């Protein structure tokens, strides 16, 4: 990919950054493992720092709804909670469904309880609305029209 192409492809049509995972590779993961047991790290599913105007508002680990259960006492999640608590930021593990889009929240620290209930399941619209509230912003009518407002069948039974 040329430098010029990268510059023109940094943002999608709606102004959000494009996915950049093509810049990463498996070799660094393998190399880091070679550094030994006393140098632990974890490759997370999709760790996001939700932010507004350059200031973080939440630390969220997104996981597909069929991913393995998360143990918040595991060193990985204790480290993430400590990181979030130091700011302090809400820390959440959020499972997602894709058809329709929906989200189930697992609370990772006390700060998250201000925004969500543990185990709360939300439609895409309700979840995104909450993310906007964290930023003290409002969902636009245009975005509102695009978001799923129902839950998948397996969540409504």
Where are the regions that the model predicts?
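Acidic-basic catalytic patches of nuclease active cores, encompassing PD-(D/E)XK
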Residues: 1-42, 53, 146, 150-154
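Active-site-adjacent loop/helix micro-motif of nuclease/hydrolase catalytic cores
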Residues: 39, 66-77
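Short connector loops at helix/strand junctions that flank enzyme active sites
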Residues: 41-43, 55-59, 75, 86-88
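Conserved catalytic cores of phosphodiester-cleaving nucleases, focusing on short active-site segments
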Residues: 44-50, 54-66
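Long, compositionally biased, intrinsically disordered segments
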Residues: 48, 52, 77, 95-96
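Nucleic-acid nuclease catalytic cores
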Residues: 84-110
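Helix-rich interaction surfaces within compact, conserved domain-sized segments
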Residues: 110-156
């Amino acid at each position: 990919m040329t430098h010029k192409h990268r510059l023109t492809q940094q943002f999608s049509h709606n102004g959000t950054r494009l996915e950049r995972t093509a810049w990463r590779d498996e070799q660094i993961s393998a190399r880091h493992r070679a550094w030994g047991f006393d140098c632990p790290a974890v490759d997370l599913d999709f760790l996001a720092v939700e932010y507004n105007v350059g200031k973080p508002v939440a630390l969220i680990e997104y996981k597909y709804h069929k991913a393995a259960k998360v143990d918040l006492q595991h060193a990985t999640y204790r480290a993430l909670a400590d990181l979030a608590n130091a700011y302090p930021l809400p820390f959440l593990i959020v499972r997602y469904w894709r058809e329709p889009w929906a989200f189930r929240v697992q609370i990772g620290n006390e700060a998250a309880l201000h925004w969500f209930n543990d185990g709360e399941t939300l439609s895409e619209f309700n979840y995104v609305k909450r993310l906007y509230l964290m930023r003290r912003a409002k969902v636009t009518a245009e975005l509102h029209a695009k978001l799923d407002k129902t839950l998948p069948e397996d969540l409504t039974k």
